[in-house]
Amino acid sequence: MTPLTLMNLMIMTLSYIIPILIAVAFLTLVERKILSYMQARKGPNIVGPFGLLQPIADGVKLFIKEPIRPSTSSPFLFIMTPILALLLALTIWIPLPLPFPMADLNLGLLFLLAMSSLTVYSLLWSGWASNSKYALIGALRAVAQTISYEVTLAIILLSTIMLSGNYTLSTLSITQEPIYLIFSSWPLAMMWYISTLAETNRAPFDLTEGESELVSGFNVEYAAGPFALFFLAEYANIMLMNTLTITLFLNPSFLNLPSELFSITLATKVLLLSSSFLWVRASYPRFRYDQLMHLLWKNFLPLTLALCLWHTSMPISYAGLPPA
């Protein structure tokens, strides 16, 4: 590989990663503002105009603090897991069309599913490496919850693949030009939305960091820079799941819109969907753990399996009919 090719690759990678990190930083500000207005208070409004520089101030503060490591923790894993979490959270964005993917993979949806499954390891190892009972319980809960809800996510993805006919995400744009998939498969979209809430450990499914019982969950022993990396990874995953939801069910490709507006439309829809995540957080109390698991294994799984069979069998059964 020539130095020029290597430099081009680095510039492409940075131009892909930096906007995501900036969006993640300002999503934290949006969250604090929305929650504060829902609770009849102002939220951050001191640092910069209307508190717009608050995420930058928070980031600088966290990264210049001294990173404290518990004496009984595993030194290598304790430092490596936050880096792994952020690395995976940024790698998953590669096949997403925004409007063009960084790598147009044939099996883009499978890549997304595989990479999101790997994030479980960063949670589990961080809880184990901390050598704290609260962190370990939080990590085990996170792993059980994430692995469980990935089952329904995979089946729903399979159903959408049946409708689009391809594993590449850009095909979904062509599929949804006449009508959004949310209209034809709204039960799948509703279950997908709730499963993404659980997959990203957001309220009311934030069992992993229940403050009243686990202090802060798997990241209880982390401070300063490593904590900031976990924080960035969590919010990057939230934005990724929302972008994927929009791509699957509310694709921003319009027949009459110029392609230059694709990114603006996508960003607006992702922001609105992220705001609904925050609305849910402000409105609902935390689920009990057994209710969380019953919701998936006793309600969502039978429904998604039935709908997957429906989406598989209907085109085949109608294919034999004569045209109207």
UniProtKB/Swiss-Prot annotation:
GO terms for biological process: aerobic respiration. Its EC number is 7.1.1.2. It comes from the Eukaryota. Belongs to the complex I subunit 1 family. HAMAP family: NDH1_NuoH (MF_01350). One of its GO terms (molecular function) is NADH dehydrogenase (ubiquinone) activity. This is NADH-ubiquinone oxidoreductase chain 1. The chain crosses the membrane at residues 10-30, 76-96, 107-127, 143-163, 178-198, 229-249, 260-280, 300-320. It is found in: Mitochondrion inner membrane. InterPro entries: NADH_UbQ_OxRdtase_su1/FPO (IPR001694), NADH_UbQ_OxRdtase_su1_CS (IPR018086). It holds the Pfam family NADHdh. The keyword NADP does not apply. Core subunit of the mitochondrial membrane respiratory chain NADH dehydrogenase (Complex I) that is believed to belong to the minimal assembly required for catalysis. Complex I functions in the transfer of electrons from NADH to the respiratory chain. The immediate electron acceptor for the enzyme is believed to be ubiquinone. Keywords: Electron transport, Membrane, Mitochondrion, Mitochondrion inner membrane, NAD, Respiratory chain, Translocase, Transmembrane, Transmembrane helix, Transport, Ubiquinone. GO terms for cellular component: mitochondrial inner membrane. It is an enzyme of class 7 (translocase). It is a multi-pass membrane protein. It catalyses: a ubiquinone + NADH + 5 H(+)(in) = a ubiquinol + NAD(+) + 4 H(+)(out).
